[in-house]
From Swiss-Prot:
This is Phosphatidylglycerol--prolipoprotein diacylglyceryl transferase. Catalyzes the transfer of the diacylglyceryl group from phosphatidylglycerol to the sulfhydryl group of the N-terminal cysteine of a prolipoprotein, the first step in the formation of mature lipoproteins. The gene is lgt. Coiled coil: none annotated. It comes from the Bacteria. One of its GO terms (molecular function) is phosphatidylglycerol-prolipoprotein diacylglyceryl transferase activity. The keyword Transferase applies. InterPro entries: Lgt (IPR001640).
């Protein structure tokens, strides 16, 4: 069994002002995505400057934060937030939904693309390889917060999370680290290598959707479902897995479509 590192969720406190690691992980994810996007910008559109890229990253970040929070409220704990709506704004306590953030990013990309003469999938193909940086950073934030841990286990790398998080004090799968390894590291490597060669429009977006859906679906088998929801069906299907099914199917469809559709005829 491995010891859980006791890390204060508050990274820095100045008087009443507290800066949480969870929030810093979002800043790291956004900053890392911007740096990587800067490297890939010339291939994407040589006419774009850093200012336009910064605008894109800003609006996508708003999509992540607003969509992620509203997604958690709608998908995971609607009754609690309806009873006390002020809880919606306490983002530093956790409670973000990837699937909600994903929807927020898609809406932001759709809006930004229309304003800047870019198709939705052109932007999504450009953005997809940037996303694992934020996903990986977010999972480290979950780990520091001692939240979203896994089921009891006797594997050698099991961890006992703090009593405030797990009163049962059982050795558990550190599922946040599994997700960091898969959604952060593995997904980044796959998309980075896949997108290095020219791909038809929608292929990179499809690969992201497919791989994320598979990775998340797999980890959910060892992750404890949200207490207020439990299992949705069959005694094992979680809300996270249910939301991943359309991502897996959609990813397969996009990849097939990208490689099999007829090229659009260009006007003479």
């Amino acid at each position: 069994m491995l010891p859980y590192p006791q890390i204060d969720p508050v990274a820095l406190a100045i008087g009443p002002l507290k800066i949480h690691w969870y929030g810093l992980m979002y800043l790291i994810g956004i900053g890392g995505a911007w740096l990587l996007a800067s490297r890939r910008l010339n291939r994407f559109d040589p006419t774009w400057n850093r200012e336009k890229l910064s605008d894109l990253v800003f609006w996508l970040s708003m999509g992540v934060i607003v969509g992620g929070r509203l997604g958690y409220v709608l998908f995971y704990d609607l009754h609690a937030y309806l009873a006390n709506p002020t809880l919606i704004f306490e983002v530093w306590k956790g409670g973000m939904s990837f699937h909600g953030g994903f929807i927020g990013v898609m809406l932001a990309a759709l809006w930004f693309g229309k304003r800047n003469n870019k198709s939705f999938f052109e932007l999504m193909d450009f953005v997809a390889p940037l996303v694992p940086i934020g996903l990986g950073a977010g999972r480290i934030g979950n780990f520091i917060n001692a939240e979203l841990w896994g089921k009891p286990t006797d594997v050698p790398w099991a961890m006992i999370f703090p009593p405030f998080s797990d009163p049962a004090q059982l050795p558990r799968h550190p599922s946040q680290l599994y997700q960091f390894a898969l959604e952060g590291v593995a997904l980044f490597v796959i998309l980075w290598l896949f997108s290095r060669k020219p791909r038809p429009t929608m292929a990179v977006s499809g690969m992201f959707s497919l791989c994320y859906g598979i990775f998340r679906f797999a980890v959910e088998f060892v992750r404890v479902p949200d207490a207020q929801l439990g299992y949705i069906a069959f005694g094992w299907l979680t809300q996270g897995q249910l939301l991943c099914i359309p991502m897996i199917v959609g990813g397969l469809v996009l990849i097939w479509w990208a490689y099999n559709r007829k090229p659009t005829a260009k006007p003479a």
